[in-house]
Amino acid sequence: GIKDWIKGAAKKLIKTVASHIANQ
């Protein structure tokens, strides 16, 4: 459902931000 999609999107966003910070 929507909640599962939001959880998945949040995890992807966190991974993207974390890797972006690590690359700096």
Swiss-Prot record:
GO CC terms in record: extracellular region
Domain of life the protein comes from: Eukaryota
Compartments where found: Secreted
Keyword hit for Transmembrane helix: no
Expressing tissues: Expressed by the skin glands.
The entry's keywords: Amphibian defense peptide, Antibiotic, Antimicrobial, Secreted
An example Gene Ontology biological process: defense response to Gram-negative bacterium
Assigned protein family: Belongs to the ascaphin family.
Function: Antimicrobial peptide. Synthetic peptide shows higher potency against Gram-negative bacteria than against Gram-positive bacteria. Has a very week hemolytic activity.
Record-given protein name: Ascaphin-5
